[in-house]
């Protein structure tokens, strides 16, 4: 059993934990062996000092070891954001996921209910008629039969129940806000991850490299969006062929018009579901444009498109042919089938 007193004492001095120490500490928390005071002390100690790549890598390895997994194709992708950007935007990554699935790329999407906004991925999918309370086996069937499946985080990470109350009491961001997107239950090796702060763009790409990912974009919009934004440049860290490089992208290079973040303001789950359906039904809007931009990046990650401009063209075809909307209808049917 981990010596929590020693771990907390180490963190209190400003020292960093090794990958193995972090893995053991998080195993203790998620197994229920740590007291709420110990968990709170460790989480805030890490937050105040700043979590390291090794600490995040160790924590993610523990979270992955304890999750309930899903069988998905090796070429499956995930488009996910950390949330916590405070934007209250429409559900960009969820909409983009259907566009990507409509291009023939299997999607294993991981997500949760809203934390900082009115509508998270789980909320809007539920409002669209997709059942989210399904087993891991059922999710795998969705990916196979519908081309897209949604993994509701609480179902796949039952050990999180031991840290949930402490997180609620702390009521501030902790390392756990970063761990969810890095702990996809389908074990995808290809992801586009949006983060709430630019400081995490390069480090999270390094964490995923440490954990064996193959093709990754970690992104943060200049307006604070945890997606690729329409309002200006977006910072990107790309993992490809074992190397990480950082750069910026803009909507201009994808052939899309710019739009202010206010144009992407969302509402509750029902309102966001109506907006998402309108995109999949072909209605032009800034929401369509931002969903296409993020889908394009995911298609680059998947190896389906050579650049954002080609990805946008493929995504537009997915929408306008009805393929993307067809994936939504199929997902609703497969989840309802039990």
From Swiss-Prot:
Enzyme class: transferase
Positions with a binding annotation for Mg(2+) 2: 226-227
One example of a Gene Ontology biological process annotation: L-tryptophan biosynthetic process
Signal sequence, start to end: none
Cofactor(s) of this protein: Mg(2+)
Cofactor: binding comment: Binds 2 magnesium ions per monomer.
Known catalytic reactions: N-(5-phospho-beta-D-ribosyl)anthranilate + diphosphate = 5-phospho-alpha-D-ribose 1-diphosphate + anthranilate
Binding-site list for 5-phospho-alpha-D-ribose 1-diphosphate: 81, 84-85, 89, 91-94, 109-117, 121
Binding site for Mg(2+) 1: 93, 227
Recorded GO MF terms: anthranilate phosphoribosyltransferase activity; magnesium ion binding
Family affiliation: Belongs to the anthranilate phosphoribosyltransferase family.
PANTHER family: ANTHRANILATE PHOSPHORIBOSYLTRANSFERASE (PTHR43285:SF2)
Subunit-level organization: Homodimer.
Protein name: Anthranilate phosphoribosyltransferase
């Amino acid at each position: 059993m981990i010596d929590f007193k020693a771990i907390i004492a180490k963190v209190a001095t400003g020292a960093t934990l090794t990958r193995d120490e972090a893995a053991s500490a998080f195993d203790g928390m998620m197994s229920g062996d740590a007291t709420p005071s110990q968990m709170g002390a460790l989480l805030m100690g890490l937050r105040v000092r700043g979590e390291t790549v090794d600490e995040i890598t160790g924590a993610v390895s523990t979270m992955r070891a304890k999750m309930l997994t899903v069988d998905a194709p090796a070429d499956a992708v995930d488009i996910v954001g950390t949330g916590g950007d405070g934007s209250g935007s429409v559900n960009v990554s969820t909409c983009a996921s259907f566009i990507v699935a409509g291009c023939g790329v299997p999607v294993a999407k991981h997500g949760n209910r809203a934390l900082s906004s009115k509508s998270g991925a789980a909320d809007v999918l539920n409002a669209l008629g997709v059942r989210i309370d399904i087993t891991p086996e059922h999710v795998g069937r969705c990916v196979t039969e519908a081309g897209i499946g949604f993994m509701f985080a609480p179902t796949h990470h039952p050990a999180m129940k031991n840290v949930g109350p402490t997180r609620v009491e702390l009521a501030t961001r902790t390392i756990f806000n970063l761990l969810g997107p890095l702990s996809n239950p389908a074990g995808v090796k290809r992801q586009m991850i949006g983060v709430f702060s630019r400081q995490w763009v390069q480090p999270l790409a390094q964490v995923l490299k440490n954990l064996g990912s193959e093709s990754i974009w970690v992104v943060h919009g200049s307006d604070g969006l945890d997606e690729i934004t329409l309002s200006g440049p977006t910072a990107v860290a790309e993992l490809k062929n074992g190397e990480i490089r950082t750069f910026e992208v803009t909507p201009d290079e994808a052939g899309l018009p710019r739009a202010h973040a206010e144009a992407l303001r969302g509402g509750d789950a029902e309102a966001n579901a109506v907006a998402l359906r309108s995109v999949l039904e072909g209605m032009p809007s800034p929401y369509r444009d931002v969903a296409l931009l993020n889908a394009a990046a995911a298609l680059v990650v998947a190896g389906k498109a050579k650049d954002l401009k080609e990805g946008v063209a493929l995504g537009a075809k997915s929408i306008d042919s009805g393929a993307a909307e067809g994936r939504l209808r199929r997902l609703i049917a497969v989840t309802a089938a039990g």
